């Protein structure tokens, strides 16, 4: 069973959570893209929802599927957000931001009554940190900000390197908000809460990819032979 099949299986399990009339946060990334396609089918069959996208890429995908959209200015409180994750541990702590949408993803998730993660089971880890942790930073003073971020990482008991992210063309990547991303290649994060607090204390840090105390459940799809087996962390 391929990775796209597993992502679709996780997305399929999330679709019944979407009820008529819901205000829905819609995530970014390949698993969220599978969810958007399935949601579009439901909308064309008569389901009435209003979505708030977490990136320009998600907005375009939703418009292609005919999903009605709004902003958090229109709908400041959402019923549910469905989004992917780069890593999730047993306490539902996440690393997100591989798709460079972490700022909008966190704003939308926190504006929601519930957040449910969809992912293939390879994203379930014992300790966060194997996936690089994205830190979104202002372009002004980026050299000083990078040094301060590295000092915060050391104080939190982590080691590794800090790399500015580039896009597919090789140019420094800019987020939808016009910020840079520093990827922290740490290997493991022994105390995510301490690292989160340390990063927040750095002027110039706009957001980071640790989502702590935000997700309510995670739907994880694993391959078992030719079939997908779906499990749930937390409560749907």
UniProtKB/Swiss-Prot annotation:
HAMAP family: Rib_5P_isom_A. Gene3D superfamilies: 3.30.70.260, 3.40.50.1360. The active site is at 105 (proton acceptor). PANTHER family: RIBOSE-5-PHOSPHATE ISOMERASE 3, CHLOROPLASTIC-RELATED (PTHR43748:SF3). Keywords: Isomerase. GO terms for biological process: pentose-phosphate shunt, non-oxidative branch. Pfam families: Rib_5-P_isom_A. This is Ribose-5-phosphate isomerase A. GO terms for molecular function: ribose-5-phosphate isomerase activity. Its EC number is 5.3.1.6. Homodimer. It catalyses: aldehydo-D-ribose 5-phosphate = D-ribulose 5-phosphate. Pathway: Carbohydrate degradation; pentose phosphate pathway; D-ribose 5-phosphate from D-ribulose 5-phosphate (non-oxidative stage): step 1/1. The keyword Isomerase applies. Substrate binds at residues 28-31, 83-86, 96-99, 123. It is an enzyme of class 5 (isomerase). Catalyzes the reversible conversion of ribose-5-phosphate to ribulose 5-phosphate. Belongs to the ribose 5-phosphate isomerase family.
């Amino acid at each position: 069973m391929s990775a796209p099949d597993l992502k679709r299986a996780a997305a399929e399990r999330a679709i019944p959570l979407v009820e008529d009339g819901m205000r829905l946060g819609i995530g970014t990334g390949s698993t969220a893209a599978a969810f958007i396609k399935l949601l579009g089918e439901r909308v064309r069959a008569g389901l009435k929802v209003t979505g708030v996208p977490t990136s320009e890429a998600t907005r375009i995908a939703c418009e292609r599927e005919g999903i009605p959209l709004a902003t958090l200015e229109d709908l400041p409180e959402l019923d549910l957000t469905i989004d992917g994750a780069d890593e999730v541990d047993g306490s539902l702590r996440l690393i997100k931001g591989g798709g460079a949408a972490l700022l909008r993803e966190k704003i939308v998730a926190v504006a929601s009554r519930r957040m449910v993660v969809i992912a293939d089971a390879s994203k379930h880890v014992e300790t966060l940190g194997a996936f690089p942790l994205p830190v979104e930073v202002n372009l002004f003073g980026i050299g000083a900000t990078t040094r301060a971020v590295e000092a915060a990482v050391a104080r939190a008991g982590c080691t590794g390197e800090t790399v500015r992210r580039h896009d597919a063309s090789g140019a420094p990547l800019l987020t939808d908000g016009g910020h840079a991303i520093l990827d922290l290649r740490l290997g493991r994060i022994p105390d995510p809460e301490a690292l989160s607090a340390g990063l927040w204390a750095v002027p110039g840090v706009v957001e980071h990819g640790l989502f702590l105390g935000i997700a309510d459940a995670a739907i994880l799809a694993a391959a078992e032979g030719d079939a997908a087996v779906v499990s749930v962390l937390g409560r749907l």
